[in-house]
């Protein structure tokens, strides 16, 4: 214990000697400096699945395209998204302790987080492999893609532990203000994934199995790289293998903050499973169009999620440092920048919808359905901005339960009600996807009201 305390004191002294620009620099510059590495990192992370979709869609067929997206993507997001939500608790805790220069607590949080990743990875692997066929059938997956979908999802979960370790490790690095190295690792692993996709799918004719194998090998590489950096750093977030274990109190703190985000992710995905089931009932062409749309749509989510992660770390460190004025200014600045980026992206996607779809498939009917979806949803993207930025802000100060409830009621529950009541009256793709802008608008209004008048952040800010 004495040795740990001395190390923590030395690491704290090292950090005190460095200026933390997140709590002292120009706000919009710090947000953008943090945002761009996260954006590019998310872009390359999305390329894992996008590369699978493009290569199998172009060289195997629309059934294979449906198998690597659609229901499989939703099920993967259900489990992995729950873990990523839980791990956000570690990011918040570490950013607050790092901002307050409490080295020993940062160390406990880092080692507990990695231990959690290992245990969760084993559990998720077992659940994913055994439950895949049942879950896909429960989603009304068309029979012609049930077999390849099962193969893809089982191989993916066989190597899911690499994904979890990378996400946790990258979250630790971002919590201390390092968003560049996670980007570099993703670039390397993404390029590896593309090369392996070409080799396995085109060269060895392994189909969806080759695409899944390429993905898990590439994710394992990114996990190794992020662990290597954590083990070599001299800062207070240094990882030592012999210290990887659960600290009960720290784990409780991480889960207390992360569980709402994890449950929120599960509720999101559960409602999306219902939507996916409704889409599946419309046939393979619509499933393929929806799968391709989800890849195109990921451009928006990359941008808005990157800003959400940026504001969480910005708020967490400034809140830990007691700088409430910077917290509020940061929120306003982040909202404005996100709105501008969303409008620009929406204009581009709307005007080049056909070209976007032709990257994924040459099937004319799939392209027609896809354009219809894209033209309907893209103009409504702006209605989601407040949800991401304000929920990220509130997570940054540890206020996560009520935002989770707002999302579960405003997005998930309302979405389910819409699908169960409106879709039977008019069962087409536009009726199904209208559930998105409807729920985004309602939930954004609720978040704005909560943030301005009732949130703990507003109460704390008004007292200083």
Q: Where in the sequence are the language-model features?
A:
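Residue-level signal for short hydrophobic patches within transmembrane helices
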Residues: 24, 28-47, 51, 75-82, ...
